[in-house]
Curated annotation (Swiss-Prot):
Molecular function terms from GO: nicotinate-nucleotide-dimethylbenzimidazole phosphoribosyltransferase activity
Involved pathway(s): Nucleoside biosynthesis; alpha-ribazole biosynthesis; alpha-ribazole from 5,6-dimethylbenzimidazole: step 1/2
EC number: 2.4.2.21
Keywords tagged on the record: Cobalamin biosynthesis, Glycosyltransferase, Transferase
Homology family: Belongs to the CobT family.
Protein name: Nicotinate-nucleotide--dimethylbenzimidazole phosphoribosyltransferase
Originating species: Agrobacterium fabrum (strain C58 / ATCC 33970)
Cystine crosslinks: none
């Protein structure tokens, strides 16, 4: 994407002109679904998922190159003691991902998913959102553009996740700015905050939204002021996937906050996305409901790292396999449902 005018201008234009679903592919998928050897609707959400795949990929439902993209960033707000872990853990976990030692690695192996890790200037934490913007408009736009590169090399199902010590504080601030309520409602334990650490976390969320209160009517301004590099990169990846007709699975609380900024800018911006799971982070269910989405899984997980989306990818793959691999009534020689008799 070439930047012209103000850094956000190209993204604003893109958000105004998002492509819609492929109605021809959707109709074809519905016609085939009606002929498969099962009672109508008996596969429940698997059938809905298959239709969603068709509509947003523009082809018969298939998942052959699924990818998990994890974006890692560090946050200046951690100087306020909002988390029990040091920011060095972000880099250490990136190295753990690369070595294959994290939970996401095992889930990717189990579900046969590709995995890419994006290190977003970990040595340079974002600004402290309680007293300054996290990013300049230029840096935020550049990070969104970088996130768009997640789909380079090809994928037909993108799972977005993150790693970043302090980023549930960021997500809570974004949700408070978007939806109102109280900092307490949106702020959860994250990596295990409790007691005084939780009190500092809530105070930081309150202070951040109060400091930036005159600039929160524009979702992209919320992103740069209260967000982080992984937030911007996830938003960019979701946008790029929309343009390239790649369905998206969104992970947990932090990834959902990034996605919510896009929906605030364009109410249809997440139509090509599903929420992989509802996390154990207390504010996530409320955030998902604000998006009008129903998560695929509810396993009490709150790890992040794309794990919930990666688990849900197995369900999406199964939905595509059922749609493409099942026999039709005619091909299998199975009788269809008897039509009700008409009284004469």
């Amino acid at each position: 994407m070439s930047m012209s005018g103000l850094p956000f201008d190209d993204f604003r234009a893109l958000l105004r002109e998002l492509p819609g679903p492929d109605t021809h592919a959707l109709v074809a998928a519905k016609e085939r679904n009606a002929q498969l050897t099962k009672p109508a609707g008996s596969l429940g959400r698997l059938e809905e998922i298959a239709m969603w795949l068709a509509a947003w990929s523009g082809r018969s439902p298939a998942v052959t190159r699924p990818l998990v993209a994890i974006f890692a960033g560090n946050h200046g707000v951690t100087r306020h003691g909002v988390t029990p872990y040091p920011t060095s853990v972000t880099q250490q976990m990136v190295e753990n991902f690369a070595a294959g030692g994290a939970a996401i690695n095992q889930i990717c192996v189990a579900n046969d998913l590709g995995l890419k890790i994006f290190d977003l200037a970990l040595d340079y934490p974002t600004g402290d959102i309680t007293c300054e913007p996290a990013l300049s408009e230029r840096d935020c736009a550049a990070t969104m553009a970088f996130g768009m590169e997640a789909i380079a090399g090809g994928t037909d199902l993108l799972c977005v996740g993150e790693m970043g010590i302090g980023n549930t504080t960021i997500a809570a601030a974004i949700n408070l700015a978007l939806y109102g309520g109280t900092a307490e409602e949106w702020t959860g334990p994250g990596t295990g905050s409790e007691g005084e650490v939780m009190a500092r976390k809530i105070a930081a969320v309150k202070a951040a939204v109060e400091f930036h209160k005159d600039h929160l009517s524009d979702p992209l301004e919320i992103m740069r002021r209260l967000g982080g590099r992984e937030i911007a990169a996830i938003a960019g990846a979701i946008l790029a996937a929309r343009v390239q007709r790649i369905p998206v699975l969104i992970d947990g609380y932090v990834a959902t906050a990034a996605a919510a900024l896009l929906k605030a800018a364009n109410s249809s911006a997440l139509d090509h996305c599903l929420i992989g799971h509802v996390s154990g982070e207390p504010g996530h269910l409320a955030a998902v409901e604000k998006l009008g989405k129903t998560p695929l899984l509810a396993l009490g997980m709150r790890l992040g790292e794309g794990t919930g989306a990666a688990l849900a990818a197995g369900i999406v793959k199964a939905a595509a396999a059922c749609h493409s691999g099942m026999a039709t009534f005619e091909a299998a020689g199975v009788d269809t449902r008897i039509s009700p008799r008409t009284e004469h």
